[in-house]
Amino acid sequence: VAERIGGNGLTAWVALTKIARLQPGESVYISSAAGGVGSAAAQFAALLGAKRIVGSTRNAEKSRTLTDRLGYTDAFVYQSGKVSAQLRDIIPEGIDVYLDNVGGEQLEAAIAAFKDYGRAALIGAVAQYSALTPPSAPYNLFDVVGKSLTLQGFLVRDYKHLQEELEEFIIPHIQSGRVVPQDTVTYGFDHIVEAFLSMLKGGNIGKAIVSIE
């Protein structure tokens, strides 16, 4: 069971409990919501008592998966240039916590949606991994000051000592079926590049795995 949690699960755990310090009754927004970290984080957040768990993704099929299988209370298909408005429409009261797997416009939207004293865990920057030019910085960075926000990046390798803590918390929930690890498996080592590019384009649900068997 433990091996199915993996680095994505530990990343989600650290982001929620140590960096963003999610509290029961709070609302959380997760970008790249169907990916390895996002799919774990939503299920963890529900167990930790989050009131609203909002996720953004690339298409309607994935959006349905977020609410049907992964524990999200709300989901939307993001549209370039409209993410802030979309997020505001879904959760007009604002968010307390943001798990940022994307950067760029998604981070900008989260800053706009934050309540005072909101906390963001900066995990990745998918928006710039394959971009020809880096995305512009969020226009509203001064809101970090005005709302007393906390934005903190981290590397999961610095938190490996928390693996046992995570396993003690999550394994009973996996065994009971309340948490279901998500994988997208590509078979054949010769398809590794294809699998990687698919992951960058959001083609996976949960952890992207290449099996050489």
Language-model-detected regions and their locations in the chain:
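Short acidic-hydrophobic, aromatic-tinged amphipathic segments that line or gate anion-handling sites
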Residues: 73-79, 184-191
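Short amphipathic alpha-helix with an adjacent loop that forms part of the alpha/beta core around
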Residues: 82-93
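Short glycine-/small-residue-rich Rossmann-like dinucleotide-binding loops
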Residues: 34, 80, 102-103, 124
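C-terminal capping/lid region of NAD(P)-dependent oxidoreductase domains
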Residues: 176-185, 193-213
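Mid-domain Rossmann-like dinucleotide-binding core that forms the NAD(H)/NADP(H) cofactor-binding site
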Residues: 3-80
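Glycine-rich phosphate-binding loop and adjacent beta-alpha segment
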Residues: 50, 66-67, 105-179, 212-213
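Short SAM/SAH-binding signature in class I
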Residues: 93-100, 118-119
